[in-house]
């Protein structure tokens, strides 16, 4: 990771998932903030322009991850945020659905930390 500390927004309606991801990412030198809903996450991303990536749980009550990602992609001030779909849905077509919504990457639960770190450091998906 570069010298600059990267800020990650973890969005999940399950506190256990937030706790686990935050513990690992903090130990790797990331600064983490959290949201428990899509609406709260969108508000945070609009208020804090130093968020480099968001880990988005796709299945949440209210505004789900798909809607959050679509809204974030429609907001030009959020184009710099790497949106990573994190979901327990791992059936055929789920990855494609997440990427079609605008996610830069897809990771299934339980999260493989090595894969997550690769996604955080890798190139952003080309926007068409």
Where are these regions (language model features)?
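C-terminal output helix
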Residues: 111-120
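Short hydrophobic/Thr-rich beta-strand motif most characteristic of the beta2 strand and flanking loop
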Residues: 29-36, 44, 107
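Receiver (REC) domain active-site loop signature in two-component systems and cognate sites
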Residues: 60
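Charged docking surfaces used in two-component/phosphorelay signaling
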Residues: 19-27
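Conserved Asp/Asn-Gly motif in the active-site loop of CheY-like receiver
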Residues: 35-39, 95
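Active-site residues of response regulator receiver
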Residues: 57, 87
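Active-site beta3 strand of CheY-like receiver
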Residues: 49-55
């Amino acid at each position: 990771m570069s010298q600059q500390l990267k800020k990650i927004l973890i969005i999940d309606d399950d506190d256990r998932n937030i706790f686990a991801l935050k513990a690992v990412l903090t130990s790797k030198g990331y600064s983490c903030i959290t949201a428990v809903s899509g609406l709260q996450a969108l508000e945070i991303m609009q208020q804090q322009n130093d968020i480099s990536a968001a880990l988005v749980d796709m299945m949440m009550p209210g505004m789900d991850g798909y809607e959050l990602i679509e809204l974030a992609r429609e907001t030009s001030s959020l184009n710099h945020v790497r949106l990573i779909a994190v979901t327990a849905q791992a059936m055929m077509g789920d990855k494609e659905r997440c990427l079609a919504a605008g996610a830069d990457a897809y990771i299934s639960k339980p999260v493989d930390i090595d894969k997550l770190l690769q996604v955080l450091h890798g190139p952003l998906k080309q926007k068409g």
